Regions:
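Sec-dependent bacterial lipoprotein signal peptides
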Residues: 1-21
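His/Met- and acidic-residue-enriched segments that coordinate or traffic transition-metal cofactors
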Residues: 21-186
Length: 186
């Protein structure tokens, strides 16, 4: 009987010791996880921009622009439309490749929404040269951002196919930016 009590007591002490010694360990993301998160956030920003710019030429349905300006806007929309399809294809191949993972601070999101609303109103309620200059300026800025975003992503990318895509996209966006800036000179 004394052995049973001793064994029972020892088991209780052991159980309490094990439960009492259990520690909650913080699980810190691995370097690979952080790298994938940063990559996906960058691609998500690029995808969001590319999606918007792929529809830039739709404004020309209701607004008039001189042929050289309309031509560059259509080139921008076409380039971005192709890039959008390629990014979506990357997502289909690799489900860890995310395109909708932007974690911008709330104030940044609100600021971007306010800018978009203001620019949209300015474009819709302007005409002639004023419209063309504003439209070209917004497109030049968008292509400049896209070119740099693609370059920075490409510098971090390890997948050779995506790396080549990003280098090509950066070059195309830089060319489109330069062409838009040239048109702003006249």
């Amino acid at each position: 009987m004394r052995n049973k009590a001793w064994i029972c007591g020892a088991l209780i002490v052991f159980a309490l010791a094990v439960m009492g010694c259990a520690t909650v360990q913080k699980v810190f993301p691995t370097a690979a996880w952080r790298q994938a998160r940063v990559r996906n956030e960058g691609y998500s920003l690029l995808y969001q921009l590319i999606c918007q710019e792929s529809d830039a030429d739709k404004l020309l349905i209701i607004k008039h622009a001189d042929p050289p300006i309309a031509e560059i806007i259509k080139k921008i929309a076409s380039t971005c439309g192709q890039a959008k399809k390629e990014l979506e294809a990357f997502h289909e191949i690799d489900r860890h490749f995310r395109l909708k993972m932007t974690h911008l601070p709330e104030i940044e999101q609100k600021s971007r929404a306010a800018i978009e609303t203001t620019v949209t109103k300015q474009l819709l309620f302007s005409s002639g040269k004023k419209f063309e200059v504003r439209f070209l300026f917004t497109q030049a800025e968008a292509m400049n951002y896209a070119a740099h975003l693609a370059k920075v992503l490409g510098d971090q990318e390890v997948n050779p196919v995506r790396k080549k895509f990003l280098a090509t996209l950066s070059e195309r966006c830089t060319t489109l930016h330069d062409q838009a800036m040239d048109l702003l000179k006249y």
